[in-house]
From Swiss-Prot:
<feature type="binding site">
    <location>
        <position position="484"/>
    </location>
    <ligand>
        <name>L-homocysteine</name>
    </ligand>
</feature>
<feature type="binding site">
    <location>
        <begin position="431"/>
        <end position="433"/>
    </location>
    <ligand>
        <name>L-methionine</name>
    </ligand>
</feature>
<dbReference type="InterPro" id="IPR038071">
    <property type="entry name" value="UROD/MetE-like_sf"/>
</dbReference>
<dbReference type="Pfam" id="PF08267">
    <property type="entry name" value="Meth_synt_1"/>
</dbReference>
<dbReference type="GO" id="GO:0032259">
    <property type="term" value="P:methylation"/>
</dbReference>
<feature type="binding site">
    <location>
        <begin position="431"/>
        <end position="433"/>
    </location>
    <ligand>
        <name>L-homocysteine</name>
    </ligand>
</feature>
<feature type="binding site">
    <location>
        <position position="605"/>
    </location>
    <ligand>
        <name>5-methyltetrahydropteroyltri-L-glutamate</name>
    </ligand>
</feature>
<dbReference type="InterPro" id="IPR006276">
    <property type="entry name" value="Cobalamin-indep_Met_synthase"/>
</dbReference>
<keyword id="KW-0479">Metal-binding</keyword>
<feature type="binding site">
    <location>
        <position position="599"/>
    </location>
    <ligand>
        <name>L-homocysteine</name>
    </ligand>
</feature>
<protein>
    <recommendedName>
        <fullName>5-methyltetrahydropteroyltriglutamate--homocysteine methyltransferase</fullName>
        <ecNumber>2.1.1.14</ecNumber>
    </recommendedName>
</protein>
<dbReference type="InterPro" id="IPR013215">
    <property type="entry name" value="Cbl-indep_Met_Synth_N"/>
</dbReference>
<feature type="binding site">
    <location>
        <position position="665"/>
    </location>
    <ligand>
        <name>Zn(2+)</name>
    </ligand>
</feature>
<comment type="pathway">
    <text>Amino-acid biosynthesis; L-methionine biosynthesis via de novo pathway; L-methionine from L-homocysteine (MetE route): step 1/1.</text>
</comment>
<feature type="binding site">
    <location>
        <position position="641"/>
    </location>
    <ligand>
        <name>Zn(2+)</name>
    </ligand>
</feature>
<keyword id="KW-0862">Zinc</keyword>
<feature type="binding site">
    <location>
        <position position="599"/>
    </location>
    <ligand>
        <name>L-methionine</name>
    </ligand>
</feature>
Length: 754
């Protein structure tokens, strides 16, 4: 039984973010649909060939998406809401873009579908919408077309499909309430049709992703798998694919299914390989997810070999990435500025394909010399002086309960803050960033490339900050921000100023749609060598009599949106960051900044996938935030911001953060998220986002007023703030001015209506 390699998916965006550039050019009307489609074809062909050359035996097809693979599945099934449909009922790529972003080059704008995080990753998916009695049919044949492309190129392939039960699990009911699981019988015929078409093309294996099987699912959902897969069986071999956690708790459900193989994540799961082998049907193939698809670290292949070698010859075996390589940058070889030692510790998507090939060859031959050679750098890292800082470790060990307590409770602090700031009812503010214009990006790029000296760079940034203050005063906002012109990314910026991080030139990963991020990498103990944000916050405050918020990214978010170390716990990393940023809060306060926002949009997304593991995570996550914030005096108002959140199941922890003001993303959910705060009787102040910054559509005054009135039915008006859902970095100035003007007008109308 020869062992084969495969990946669960590959990055879509291209080494130079070619897909992003093509999407945005098309959306702006600067290129044709045909040009966009051509870029997609070119990227797919390149990525298949690169994986093949790196040693992958079975190439994934269907992992490419124009916006998001869950959205692609919605179109495949004909699940398009009335507001997004073409007038003639057809489905095309503009339909897809209208669902994802609210508008497209053709068709009428409409509210975008909700977006949320893909399990506990930094990738976002577009939430499917379900209505009672809806019909499904095959309307989008992208998968079949791409299979034809790959076969025409002579590749040995494995199509990828998001499974029907997970697809339903990821969606939400719109309109009349009903159990969306009842739609399973209606979508299965479409899946049967697709599998039949794949069988006609001579496809042997289909990777059918059911990551919901790693969750603690309700029994009704677990029971749904057997009839679903009974209906899908028989046309092709099915590789039931799971990731992000182990499958052992749901293994009884899995082994009853009529599939021919199982993929398990052996990085993030705690499954015992020997137990899996013992319990799986003898004729099943086991796909072992041994190479981490979610990080940038080189694998110790000697450990991976030892983990799986006992199964060689005992059952059909493939070796694979733990999950799709979507979550990893593409190619380490183009990184020319990384220190040689540090670079030797890393492996990006293509290098991970190479790791799989090395592992396959060793398992097939029994020869391990190549594994030992590959693993030597990552083994040597354990003793590197770049990794350990005795002062940081000592400070971390000395943390006491007092370090995470504000001086007085919220009620006392709120009085001091009201006396200091004298804000009106319905105070208006923004979340932090303003549009990152071509001029701002060019300024930063010229400075990084050495084409601009420090003095001219600072002069340029200062001018953009000044303009941001002028714009906000002109609009009539109550609490201002400096606009973050100096920041490329809310995590990368802090990582650049903290010891213990390194950065890549081209380590881009997709966040959503055309948005890509370049996460920093935590390589060692973290400390702050000097103040980070104080200079620009102090300058911005000098330009206005209104309060200007200091803007920090919180410790859990920096952790979650970075590639973390693998040799210490996530708790250790978060608390090291918290101690570093605690010093930043103290310095901002000393510089006269009275409102400090510590963004924690990632707090919820960092939750373990199994609810039984939540308490331990939330305990240290909340403690890290409080360590960061607790140094502030009573009269200093601490804000936090969160997005993409369902709060009802973590309200105790949200309240335990003890932030004076929390701003949250609520507009896409029509203020539904406030139900959690109402039910909990949340005691502090709240800024529910009143418009969706991910869409270029400008909300009307009436729309915003209606949302705020809804909010006031749940939260006392005296504790409500008025703000957008999120930062405005990705928007243009014309739509930003128009939206904020309407937001301020809505707040003024409500003040006058008192």
């Amino acid at each position: 039984m020869t062992i084969l390699t495969h990946t669960l998916g590959f990055p879509r965006v291209g080494l130079r973010r070619e897909l992003k550039k093509a999407q945005e050019s098309y959306w702006a009307g600067n290129s044709t649909r045909e040009a966009l489609l051509a870029v997609g074809r070119e990227l797919r062909a390149r990525h298949w060939e690169q994986q093949k050359q790196a040693g992958i035996d079975l190439l994934p097809v269907g992992d490419f998406a124009w916006y998001d693979h869950v959205l692609t599945t919605s179109l495949l099934l004909g699940n398009v809401s009335a507001r997004h449909q073409n007038n003639d009922g057809s489905v095309d790529i503009d339909t897809l873009f209208r669902i994802g972003r609210g508008r497209a080059p053709t068709g009428e704008p409409a509210a975008a579908a909700e977006m949320t995080k893909w399990f506990n990753t930094n990738y976002h998916y577009i939430v499917p919408e379900f209505s009672k009695g809806q019909q499904f049919r095959l309307t989008w044949t992208q998968l079949l077309e791409e299979v034809d492309e790959a076969l025409a190129l002579g590749h040995k392939i494995k199509p990828v499909l998001l499974g029907p039960v997970t697809y339903l699990w990821l969606g939400k009911v719109k309109g009349e309430p009903f159990d969306r699981l009842t739609l399973l019988k209606d979508i299965l015929p479409v899946y049967q049709h697709v599998l039949a078409e794949l069988a006609k093309r001579g496809i042997e294996w289909v990777q059918i992703d059911e990551p919901a099987l790693v969750l603690e699912l309700p029994q009704a959902w677990l029971d749904a798998f057997k009839p679903a897969y009974d209906a899908l069986a028989g046309q092709v071999k099915l590789l039931l694919t799971t990731y992000f956690e182990g499958v052992t708790p749901n293994l009884d459900t899995i082994i009853a299914l009529p599939v021919q193989g199982l993929h398990v994540d052996l990085i993030h799961g705690k499954d015992d390989v020997a137990e899996l082998h013992q319990r799986l049907p003898v004729d099943w193939l086991l796909s072992a997810g041994l190479i981490n698809g979610r990080n940038v670290w080189r694998a110790d292949l000697t450990e991976k070999y030892a983990q799986i070698n006992a199964l060689v010859g005992k059952r059909a075996l493939w070796v694979a990435s733990s999950c799709s390589l979507l979550h990893s940058p593409i190619d380490l070889s183009v990184e020319t500025r990384l220190d040689t030692e540090v670079k030797s510790w890393f492996a990006f998507a293509l290098q991970k394909c190479g790791e799989l090939a090395l592992l396959r060859d060793a398992l097939n031959s029994g020869e391990t010399a190549a594994l030992e050679e590959w693993s030597a750098p990552i083994q040597a890292r354990r003793h590197s002086r770049r990794v350990h800082n005795a002062a940081v470790e000592k400070r971390l060990a000395a943390i006491t309960a007092q370090d995470s307590q504000r001086e007085n409770p919220y009620e006392v602090r709120a009085e001091a803050q009201r006396a200091r700031f004298k804000l009106p009812a319905w105070p208006t503010t923004t979340i932090g960033s303003f549009p990152q214009t071509t001029e701002i990006r060019g300024l930063r790029l010229d400075f990084k490339k050495g084409n601009l000296d420090a003095n001219n760079y600072h002069t340029g940034i200062a001018e953009h900050i000044k303009q941001a203050i002028i714009e906000q005063e002109r609009l009539g906002l109550d609490v201002l921000v400096h606009g973050e012109a100096e920041r490329n990314d809310m995590v990368e910026y802090f990582g650049e100023h903290l010891d213990g991080f390194v950065f890549t030139q081209n380590g881009w990963v997709q966040s959503y749609g055309s948005r890509c991020v370049k996460p920093p990498v935590v390589i060692g103990d973290i400390s702050r060598p000097a103040p980070i944000t104080v200079e620009w916050a102090k300058y911005a405050q000098s330009l206005t009599d209104k309060p200007v918020k200091g803007m920090l990214t919180g410790p859990v978010t920096i952790l979650c949106w970075s590639f973390p170390r693998e040799d210490v716990t996530r708790e250790t990393i978060a608390k090291q960051i918290a101690l570093a940023l605690r010093d930043e809060v103290a310095d901002l306060e000393a510089a006269g900044i009275g409102i400090i926002q510590i963004d924690e949009p990632a707090l919820r997304e960092g939750l373990p996938l199994r609810r039984s593991d939540w308490d331990a995570y939330l305990e240290w996550g909340v403690e890290a935030f409080r360590i960061n914030a607790a140094v502030a005096k009573d009269e200093t108002q601490i804000h936090t911001h969160m997005c993409y959140c369902e709060f009802n199941d973590i309200m105790d922890s949200i309240a335990a953060l003890d932030a004076d003001v929390i701003t949250i993303e609520t507009s896409r959910s029509d203020m539904e998220l406030l139900e959690s705060f109402e039910a909990f009787d949340y005691p502090n102040e709240i800024g529910p986002g009143v418009y969706d910054i991910h869409s270029p559509n400008v909300p009307s005054v009436e729309w915003i007023e209606a949302l705020l009135k809804k909010a006031a039915q749940r939260i006392p008006a005296q504790r409500l703030w008025v703000n957008p859902d999120c930062g405005l970095k990705t928007r243009g100035w014309p739509e930003t001015r128009a939206a904020l003007a309407n937001m301020v007008k809505a707040a003024h109308n409500l003040r006058q209506a008192k």
